[in-house]
Amino acid sequence: MVSTTTFLMLTSIATLTSARSHLTVTIGSNCTLKGPQGGHVFWWRIYDNGWFTKPCDQPGRFFCNGRDLTIINVTANDKGFYYGTDYKSSLDYNIIVLPSTTPAPRKTTFSSSSAANNTISNPTFTALLKRTVNNSTTISTSTISIIAVVTIGISILVFTITYYTCCYKKDEHKGDPLLRFDI
């Protein structure tokens, strides 16, 4: 039972993280993040402490053309998570920055998901994401994986209860004498 639960947890974590694009770039290079194909894309830079910024509001460091985001002259401070959405679909990127002496591996882009830093608090960003989900016509990979894990967990629980009630036979002679009422 414990090994099954561990397997399910690891599978769901792998499903959640597989949707994010991981890009490795070197210091001093330029990096372009492709946005969703829909309308105008809004980009967010997400920090580990829950704050986020709009990179397009910093024209010297970033270039936005309405869909793509280009990080100009990448520095070590540019590592982290970038989130682009057109409120119908979204893409997430995890930027890993290497020193310029280390050659960067080729860019590999997968389908993406979420991540955040600005002077606006985390609840505001959560409200923004809720609005994004409400306007979306597709279900994200993370939502599907969470639903699958919950369904499997409930199935295991129902199976365990059914097994206990059907297969456990109580010996008639063993019983608590205080609970017997032989009159």
From Swiss-Prot:
Top-level taxon in the UniProt lineage: Viruses
SUPFAM superfamilies: Immunoglobulin (SSF48726)
Glycoprotein among keywords: yes
UniProt keyword terms in alphabetical order: Early protein, Glycoprotein
List of glycosylated residues: 30, 73, 117, 134-135
Claim: Glycoprotein is one of the keywords in the record: yes
Family: Belongs to the adenoviridae E3_20 family.
Protein name: Early E3 20.2 kDa glycoprotein
Taxonomic lineage: Viruses, Varidnaviria, Bamfordvirae, Preplasmiviricota, Tectiliviricetes
